[in-house]
């Protein structure tokens, strides 16, 4: 395995809308998500095995910082995660959008094993892109 990068940026959008026929979306990132672009390192995040980085190799970052796990050629990427428990959410349907990538340097091969998750939902991460998923809050937490 060559160098492998996994970059996550939680600064996309967290929106909420009503489940009624008339759908109204409201941007709620700043209301519920703390330190969404990791500008304060891992403050407010549960981190296991990831590091912050400030170089320019992740073009979708918002601000100066992003999160990555990088390993040298011939090494395997270890299990890692970064998460945040959101509380006091209003009941409803939410959409989480995250800028992320899961790549092996100098290879166009599709990589696996990286996910964006919220509550019981997840979406697989591959090439650099915005990844979205929806989840439902019933008891105020995700």
Where does each model-flagged region fall?
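Extracellular carbohydrate recognition and processing domains
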Residues: 117-142
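Short coil-to-beta strand junction motifs in C2/discoidin
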Residues: 108-114
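Extracellular glycan-recognition surfaces and repeat-rich motifs
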Residues: 27, 37-77
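Boundary/junction segments of secreted and surface-exposed precursor proteins
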Residues: 24-34
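Bacterial Sec-dependent N-terminal signal peptides
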Residues: 1-26
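Extra-cytoplasmic beta-strand recognition segments
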Residues: 38, 80-108, 133
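Short structured motifs
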Residues: 69-70, 81-85, 117-118, 129-132
């Amino acid at each position: 395995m060559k160098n492998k990068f996994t970059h996550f940026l939680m600064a996309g959008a967290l929106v909420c809308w009503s489940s009624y026929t008339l759908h109204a979306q409201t941007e709620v990132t700043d209301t519920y998500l703390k330190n969404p672009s990791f500008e304060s390192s891992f403050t407010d995040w549960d981190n296991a095995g990831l590091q912050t980085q400030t170089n320019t190799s992740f073009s979708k970052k918002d601000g100066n910082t992003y999160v990555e796990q990088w390993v040298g050629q011939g090494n395997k990427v270890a299990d890692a995660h970064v998460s945040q428990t959101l509380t006091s959410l209003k009941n409803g349907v939410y959409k989480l959008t995250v800028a992320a990538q899961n790549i092996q340097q100098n290879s166009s091969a599709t990589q696996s094993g990286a996910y964006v998750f919220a509550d019981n939902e997840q979406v697989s991460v591959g090439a650099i892109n915005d990844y979205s998923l929806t989840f439902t809050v019933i008891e105020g937490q995700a």
